[in-house]
Curated annotation (Swiss-Prot):
Its main location: other. It comes from Drosophila melanogaster. This is Intraflagellar transport protein 172 homolog. Keywords: Cell projection, Cilium, Developmental protein, Repeat, TPR repeat, WD repeat. The gene is Oseg2. TPR repeats lie at residues 623-656, 690-723, 748-781, 807-840, 852-885, 1041-1074, 1140-1166, 1167-1199, 1211-1250, 1282-1315, 1698-1733. One of its GO terms (cellular component) is ciliary basal body.
Length: 1754
């Protein structure tokens, strides 16, 4: 959070003028300030003062100064202002909506005591805290108030929550109480916490609350009152009590105010914790009295006790979106959006979930905003200020947003379409679809003002199917299938109708209620619903078609039109179709009346609709609208309007019928008083008019009028329903009714129906007769089959059969034949009638051999009936697989077709259908199956094209590589890449080229298109060694084009920031050059650029620049250091700086040149005379130094003279020495020197003349010297002294003054003792006195002095006893330690210290002593590890390892590793290798670096250092054992280290094999191959060694061209090593190899110890380079590669390193590695011919490593 000062609204005063309150209106337009003089100042949102008014006291008699303002709060609607006063009243002022409105008091709320705090909740209540501790709610609407609760002490603060539904009150005793004004609270009410101090600063942010006070601590609590975090500022210098707090509107920041300081605390949604984010100190602000955040969180206003009011901007960060919008983040979850192009109020966008907003984008023609958090998506309609936040999981930002619909946003992500309605915080609906074009999606949400919720979505399920979804119920309300692909659809505004257009440009209308689909018109180029109506406008060719009544689509109005219709506009009472004809536009106005008719009908305004239709007269469109209005009126029960409509239509019968209904309704209304439409007879007739007979019947029966219901059915000729109703209701005249029914049937020649009735009544014979009479053989046959006795009548059955055959009812005829036991005839009839199921049943019994033919015949029959899907199984049963496949394909049963095709083996049989089947499989997502189908059909090119269309370039390449010629494949894919490139699909083109292993072409493509980022990405992946050079090349190219910014990026990426700086400086863009130097270069570099920049400018400008950069002094220093003193002087002059430093630098420069006089002048100009003096002193020119001192620095004259005197003393010139020091008034120095030299006579002479005060000291020193000499000549009687001490000690002991006695005895020492025994006796007596008579401090003090003396005379026991008696156990133990009596020391330590700490101390001291003495054997008995460490320190490694070997393996390996590390540091890698071969190499991770170093150092050895290959074999065996150990450890078997050891083992094996091959003449070519193969591993080998050895072997073999390339590269590498630049070596000559191009360079060249050989190689290369006959490049084979290089699928030969080629390579049982058969044969022959060579070892190790070889020698 950043606080930026904006402006001061009120200046602070010299005396206390406390700001009583601040209030910001919720609409952010007004800021109210309550001043100390009881006035209210009103400011607008720009901070300009707009109004002022005074408050009034509760009792005017008390005067205007009888109160102060205690609180201020705006109403939620921003029109009212509440003012709380100390005279126990709250006034509510109505301010109005504009500045000119009159201010009046609209509410008064007198209180029982003074108001101390005031807030106005957004829920509507004013909350006032009182001096008596009560908290009251004041209701402005009802002008009533109520007490909410009372506290035990004065209410000092109030804080509302962010929702405005609850508040906290802080009381003077530290109590904090929570209260909610609504019932939705989930947190407990009442006291939540007891704060340690009065909570004057109280706020309620999200997730809890916080408080601060006079203890200078800010405490954050959770919602239950538990402390979350405390910020203690009591130790902060200058910090005082916290007086006020304010919470930001979103609750994610809190501001606390104290003395001259504001502290901002912010909530981090990600960390879930509060932290102090900003502190703002404002001098002379004094204590803050008010603090308030604006509603949008972007402004913070504060008031102080001095009367100052300041305005700050509080933002986290701000950014500008495309120079159109400014995005201001005021909190992690809130931002403001302000338009930069149009003056408008900033919109607030906030995460309702409190999540941090990460990404913000303005989209949809700058009308919509999309913001993201970790768990949600925020969508905002900027034009209507509607926002929605919906849950949204992270999806990689792959969503696509569509804003074409003004009410809903469409979001497409991974095949799912989600709809979000603006202003709603939930997803309206989600559907699965792949078609997200806005033209094929239609959404209608509550349009046309429908009272009922109506939200519908129409979209494409597939290209030919439309789905309509009810978004409220989330159910599918309709699904429309079409035979052609659909390219446009749209619902009507009420969603009752759906229009869509297909690819054949046909316009189809669908009724969503009935599902009826109807084609309206063809060749449609434009179609649109007219806004706010159900009118449709479409263009077909040059005609405009208008459907004013879409319910009657056959009634269409046609109108010619010019150009192409582009839109339909409806505004200002006109509906216009706009068309575009070239550059001109045309407008065609529709009949607004007809359009308005639809609106009137929709609004049920029938009168307006009838009036309009009557005005139309006989227009064709009127008829359709009369009809439509009639139907709507009937549905609404408006009979008169319906009658009028039918009369207008000329439908006399319906008009007459309705007239009767109207009459009946009127009569019913007159008689009953109820609406006529409720008349049962009217309702029944209305149902009958709508053909709803069941409803009419129900209405009659509800009234008990069954006769009317029967009559209705009889009139309609529905006798069956009448009879059924009579039977159901138990009608008493049912027999008569049935007879009437039969008479009616016979009279109307309905014999069949009469037969059915007789059959139901059981009169079968008569029914049979009627069926035959009516020529209904099928009815007769079915009756006969159910009636056995009729079957017995052959004559009747013959007539029935003949009738059936004539009617071609062969199946029924077959049934009769089958029942009459004529199976052959039945089979023939069934086959003729297509009843193959029945035919098969009979055929399996009668003719089993024809079953297969019947199945195939059945299949053919079904195919002829177009029932292809049903025929498939029958063809399969018949074994006609080809026909089954044709039928499955024809029926589009792709799954079955694929299964059948898999059964067919011949490609020719499935080629005809393979392409179609593959397309289906690909569409279904089974790309593998599609590929297999085409490959099986030998349609390889089709398979490649299919895979390419789906982006599977690698698989397509594999098919082409396998089945097509290589050149053909490459040409095919490169051509495809070119096509993709032309289409702008560069990433797809790249994938294709990568698939065919042509990254260089992809790089070239990006270079052509100037897509340098992608180009660099590929270079980094495939040519990492050329990355820096590519960056440099692009940078130079961009620089030449003037694209300096882009060039800078590439210069910096290549690490050549200096070139970027030079580029900018050369082009005069110094500021950019300085920026790059400062960001990427060193500090000195940026300063140097700034200096050069300044040099390029006039001096005045240079001074301003350097001052701005803070580099003026640095630039002056640069100028002086470079000798440009004039420029430095000019800088100082223009900057107003003293030039002393410049003069000083000039003087020092002149001094270095020996120009002392000129230097002196400059030193003096620099006011540095002392430096001039020092210069002359260093030069030995004492007179010049003295002159300068006398003239310019008199205080230094003495120093010069002293220096000159010192120089005279060095030459023993005592005369000048004395004269100069006396001239300097320093005789004391002369005397001190003579004293040191013991020249007291000379010293006395000088003192007498010049320093009389020193005479006494000199004479005393001289006398002491003389006495010392006399004492040396005469000695004293020591015996008398010692006896006197003994006598005095005895006297003190008698007087029991034991300490004095002991001290007296201790006065006897070796200087005054009579003999040694006297001294010993005296000290022992003193010790005895201490032990017996002294204790405490006396004993300890004497023991500290006496103990060492006893120890000195070897009295060890008494000394220890003395320390023990004085309670000094450690010193007692130290006695035995110092005398190395270790057993006594241990015994004593055990006795006196049960905790054994002293015993550990003794053992530690003994170890240290033994280590110091080097007593290893004895030390080993005590501490074997210390003994081993000592051996290691002394370099006795064999003894160390032998001792460790006998202990445990882990200890042994520790010292083996230490010894090996030492050997490696000493450069003795072979000994270290032998060490691990002797003692083993455990798979311990701590040793891995040692193993790697041994391998690298050994591989760097010259061939002459390996003892004819012994080292290679040892290294190989060591690595093999190590790998075996690693594989035995599961945790290490697959690690990176194991993989690197595999590589080292392979290299060591190659070296050992090469060494063995060089011993055998026949294997010399194999040795050469190995030298070349080893170059593949120069990322591990020293690169110069590898190329040197390969080049020399090639040269020896006579292959000079290849040798030249190798040795030339060797010289290039050596040159790079010697220069130490780290630059990559040119690898272009080795492009056809698989040698790594980016390899580490060794520190020294391989031949550093043999420079003559190195020079020989250089001379040979030089000579060959001049030879024109040598090709000087590497040859390539048929693969286009160098012979040793491995292709993508090649394996290296385990004995030669070359690719395994040829037939039947030698394989191994233990691995997948191989050996070329000819190489193995050579080794086998060499083993027999040279049994003493190392070939046997090579073959043995190879089989040991890889397993037994599968090789039989022929």
């Amino acid at each position: 959070m950043q606080l930026k000062y904006l402006r001061t609204l009120l200046e602070g005063q010299e005396q206390i003028q406390r700001i009583a309150g601040l209030a910001w209106s919720p609409n952010q337009q007004r800021l109210a300030i309550a001043t100390a003089d009881r006035h209210i100042l009103l400011y607008d949102d720009a901070g300009e003062r707009r109004d002022k008014f005074s408050t009034k006291p509760a009792n005017p008699a008390n005067g205007k100064n009888s109160y102060v303002i205690r609180g201020l709060a705006f109403s939620p609607d921003s029109t009212k202002l509440a003012v709380g006063q100390s005279d126990s009243i709250v006034y509510v002022y109505k301010l109005g909506e504009s500045w000119n409105d009159k201010k009046v008091i609209c509410n008064k709320f007198p209180q029982a005591s003074a108001v101390t705090a005031l807030i106005w909740l957004t829920s509507g209540s004013i909350i006032a805290g009182l001096e008596d501790g009560k908290v009251r709610a004041l209701h402005s609407k009802s002008n009533k108030s109520q007490s909410l609760y009372g506290g035990d002490s004065i209410c000092i603060s109030l804080a509302a929550n962010t929702k405005g539904t609850g508040f906290l009150s802080g009381h003077n005793d530290g109590t904090i109480i929570r209260y909610f004004m609504t019932d939705e609270a989930t947190e407990p009410l009442g006291r939540v916490v007891q704060h340690p101090v009065p909570p004057f600063a109280l706020a309620w942010p999200q997730g809890g609350f916080c408080a601060g006070g006079c203890d200078q601590r800010i405490v954050f609590y959770d919602s239950m009152g538990r402390q979350l975090r405390t910020f203690d500022h009591s130790r902060t210098e200058g910090e005082r009590e916290f007086t006020v707090a304010a919470c930001s509107p979103n609750g994610q920041a809190v501001a606390f105010g104290s003395f001259d300081r504001i502290r901002i605390f912010a909530w981090s949604p990600r960390q879930g914790a509060w932290s102090e984010s900003a502190t703002k100190e404002v001098a002379c602000l004094y204590t803050l009295s008010s603090l308030l955040w604006r509603r949008d969180g972007a402004r913070l206003a504060l008031g102080s006790v001095s009367g100052a009011v300041l305005l700050f901007e509080s933002v986290l960060r701000r950014t500008v979106w495309q120079d159109k919008f400014e995005l201001i983040f005021v909190a992690p979850s809130q931002l403001l959006v302000r338009s930069l192009t149009e003056p408008s109020q900033a919109l607030t966008i906030e995460s309702q979930l409190g999540l941090e907003i990460d990404d913000v984008r303005i989209m949809g023609r700058d009308n919509y905003l999309v913001a993201r958090t970790e768990e949600s998506l925020i969508l905002c309609d900027l034009t209507r200020n509607l926002s929605s936040e919906v849950p949204w999981t992270a999806s990689g930002h792959h969503e696509r947003f569509y804003f074409e619909n003004p009410t809903v946003c469409l979001i497409f992500n991974v095949g799912e379409l989600s709809l979000v309605e603006y202003g709603e915080n939930s997803i309206l609906g989600s559907v699965r679809t792949e078609f997200v074009n806005p033209h094929v999606i239609s959404v209608r949400l509550n349009e046309r003002g429908n009272a009922k919720e109506n939200k519908k979505l129409a979209f494409l399920l597939d290209a030919k199917t439309i789905c309509v979804v009810d978004l409220i119920s989330r159910m599918t309300s309709g699904q429309i299938s079409h035979e052609t692909k659909i390219d446009w659809l749209e619902l009507s505004e009420t969603a009752h109708k759906l229009l869509f257009r297909d690819k054949k440009l046909r316009l189809i209308l669908v009724d969503n209620y009935t599902g009826k689909k109807q084609t309206l018109l063809s060749n449609i180029s434009f179609v649109q619903w007219v806004p706010q109506s159900d009118v449709v406008v479409a263009q077909s060719n040059s005609n405009l078609a208008i459907w004013y009544n879409i319910d009657l689509p056959e009634h269409v109005t046609m109108q010619s039109v010019r150009g192409e219709a582009i839109e339909v506009l409806r505004e200002n009472g006109r509906t216009v179709v706009r068309s575009q004809d070239g550059p001109s536009e045309h407008n065609y106005q529709l009949d607004e009346g007809l359009v308005e008719f639809g609106t009137a009908v929709n609004d049920s305004d029938f009168g307006r609709a009838v009036h309009f239709l009557e005005s139309l007269g006989d227009k064709p469109a009127a008829k359709a609208m009369w009809h439509n209005l009639a139907l709507i009126a009937l549905e609404d029960g408006n009979l008169r309007v319906a009658q009028r409509c039918y009369a207008a239509l000329g439908n006399v019968s319906k008009a007459y019928y309705l007239a009767g209904m109207i009459q009946q309704a009127d009569e019913f209304e007159e008689s009953s008083g109820s609406p006529g439409i409720l008349c049962p007879e009217v309702r029944a007739k209305l149902a009958l008019l709508g053909s709803d007979l069941r409803t009419a019947e129900r209405i009659y029966l509800e009234q008990g009028d069954i006769e009317s219901a029967l009559k209705m059915y009889q009139q309609l000729g529905m006798w069956d329903e009448a009879v059924a109703l009579a039977e159901r209701r138990g009608y008493n005249r049912i027999a008569e009714l049935k007879q009437q029914h039969m008479d009616y049937l016979l009279s109307s020649e309905q014999q069949e129906k009469a037969g059915q009735v007789l059959e139901e009544q059981g009169d079968l014979q008569q029914a049979m007769s009627l069926y035959m009479k009516a020529n209904k053989p099928a009815r007769a046959a079915r009756l006969a089959l159910k009636t056995p006795h009729i079957l017995q009548d052959e004559q009747v059955m013959l007539q029935v059969t003949e009738g059936l055959v004539r009617s071609e009812l062969y199946e029924l005829a077959g049934d009769i034949a089958h029942r009459l036991s004529r199976p052959e005839a039945a089979l023939a009839l069934y086959r003729k009638g297509g009843a193959y199921a029945r035919a098969l049943e009979i055929g399996r019994v009668v003719a089993p051999q024809e079953v297969t033919a019947l199945e195939e015949e059945w299949g053919d029959w079904l195919v002829s009936r177009k029932q292809l899907d049903a025929s498939i199984n029958h063809y399969i049963e018949a074994g006609a697989t080809q026909k089954a496949l044709e039928a499955a394909v024809g029926a589009k049963q792709w799954r079955k077709a694929v299964q059948i095709a898999k059964v067919l083996d011949e490609p020719e049989l499935i080629q005809r259908y393979a392409v179609d089947l593959a397309k289906h499989l690909a569409f279904a997502g089974d790309l593998d199956g599609a590929e297999d189908m085409l490959v099986r059909a030998n349609l390889h090119k089709d398979a490649i094209e299919l895979l390419n269309r789906h982006g599977k370039w690698e698989r397509a390449y594999l098919i082409g590589e396998k089945h097509l010629k290589a050149e053909q494949v490459r040409e095919l894919f490169v051509q495809l890449a070119g096509t993709l490139e032309e289409q702008g699909k560069f990433r797809d083109a790249e994938k294709v080229l990568i698939a065919v292993n042509e990254p260089d072409l992809a790089i070239a493509m990006y270079k052509r298109r100037e897509l340098y980022d992608s180009m660099i990405r590929l270079v980094e992946r495939y040519h990492k060694d050329l990355l820096d050079s590519t960056h440099l090349h692009l940078a130079r190219q961009l620089e030449s084009r003037g694209k300096l910014k882009n060039a800078e990026m590439h210069f910096v990426a290549s690490g050549d920031w200096k070139s970027a700086v030079h580029m900018y400086c050369s082009s005069g863009r110094w500021e950019d050059g300085y920026r790059v130097a400062k960001l990427k270069g060193t500090e000195g570099a940026s300063q140097q650029v700034a200096y050069m920049w300044a040099k390029s400018m006039p001096t005045e400008g240079a001074v301003r620049l350097l001052s701005k950069l803070g580099l003026l002094d640095t630039a002056v220093g640069f100028a002086c250091d470079s000798g440009q003193f004039e420029f430095a002087m000019e800088l100082c002059k223009f900057a107003g700086k003293p030039t002393d430093e410049v003069h000083l630098k000039i003087a020092m420069s002149l001094e270095d040149e020996g120009k002392f006089e000129a230097a002196e002048a400059e030193f003096l100009k620099a006011n540095k005379p002392r430096e001039a003096i020092l210069m002359y002193q260093h030069a030995g020119d004492w007179q010049a130094a003295l002159n300068v001192a006398e003239n310019h620095l008199p205080d230094a004259v003495g120093e010069v003279l002293i220096g000159q005197a010192s120089a005279a003393l060095e030459t023993s010139n005592y005369k000048d020495y004395e004269a100069l020091l006396l001239r300097a008034h320093r005789p004391d120095l002369i005397i001190e020197h003579y004293k040191q030299e013991s020249l007291y006579e000379d010293a006395l002479r000088i003192a007498e003349e010049h320093y009389p005060s020193a005479l006494n000291d000199l004479r005393r020193l001289q006398a002491q010297l003389q006495r010392g000499q006399a004492q040396a000549q005469a000695g004293e009687d020591a015996a008398s002294i010692s006896r006197s001490y003994l006598q005095k000690a005895a006297e003190f002991a008698k007087k029991e003054q034991f300490r004095k006695a002991a001290e007296c005895l201790m006065q006897i020492d070796s200087s005054n003792a009579e003999d040694a025994s006297t001294l010993e006796r005296a000290l022992l007596r003193a010790a005895e006195i201490c032990n017996q008579f002294l204790e405490g401090q006396d004993a300890q003090e004497l023991a500290q002095s006496l103990g060492p003396r006893l120890l000195a005379i070897k009295q060890i026991g008494p000394a220890a006893q003395l320390y023990l008696a004085a309670d000094m156990p450690k010193q007692a133990v130290d006695v035995f330690i110092k005398t190395e009596q270790w057993s006594k020391a241990r015994r004593l330590a055990k006795e006196i210290d049960p905790d054994l700490q002293l015993l550990a101390y003794v053992e530690q001291q003994q170890k240290a002593s033994l280590k110091h003495e080097g007593n290893i054997e004895q030390l080993a008995d005590i501490d074997i590890v210390s003994a081993l460490d000592l051996l290691a320190e002394h370099g006795e490694w064999q003894r160390c390892l032998e001792k460790a070997k006998g202990l445990n393996p882990a200890l042994l390996q520790k010292y083996v590793a230490v010894y090996a590390a030492q050997l490696i540091r000493e450069g003795n890698c072979t000994t270290a290798l032998g060490l691990y071969l002797s003692y083993g190499a455990p798979p311990i991770e701590a040793h891995f670096n040692i193993y790697t170093r041994i391998a690298l150092d050994c591989l760097a050895l010259r061939e002459e250092q390996t003892e004819r290959g012994t080292t290679w074999r040892q290294l190989r065996d060591f690595l093999f054992r190590l790998l075996q150990s690693l594989k035995a450890t599961p945790a290490q078997s697959q690690t990176k280290f194991a993989a690197s050891m595999e590589q080292f083992l392979l290299i060591a094996h190659y070296y050992a094999t090469r060494a063995a091959c060089k011993e055998v003449q026949a294997l010399q070519p194999v040795a050469l191959r190995l030298s070349l193969a080893l170059l593949r591993h120069t990322d591990l080998l020293p690169v110069d060694k590898g190329f040197y050895e390969a080049g020399m072997d090639l040269r020896q073999a006579g292959r000079e061209a290849e040798a030249f390339v190798m040795l030339n590269h060797y010289l290039d590498v050596c040159e790079a090593i010697e220069e130490g630049s780290g630059q990559l070596v040119d690898h272009s000559d080795l492009a056809s190899t698989d040698f790594p191009s980016s390899v580490p360079l060794p520190e020294d060249i391989h031949l550093k110890n043999d420079p003559s050989l190195h020079e020989e190689v250089r001379e040979w290369v030089l000579a060959v380079s001049m030879d024109q006959q040598v090709d000087q490049q590497l040859p390539t084979d048929d693969r286009g590669l160098y012979e040793s290089s491995l292709g993508p699928n090649d394996l290296p030969c385990m004995l030669s390193g070359f690719p395994v080629r040829g037939r039947q390579p030698v394989t191994f049982q233990g691995s997948s590695n191989q050996v070329n058969r000819d190489v193995w044969s050579k080794f086998s022959v060499a083993l027999k011919m040279s049994p003493g060579s190392g070939i046997a070892d090579i073959i043995s190790f190879t089989e040991k490593w890889q397993g037994a070889a599968n090789y039989v020698m022929h």
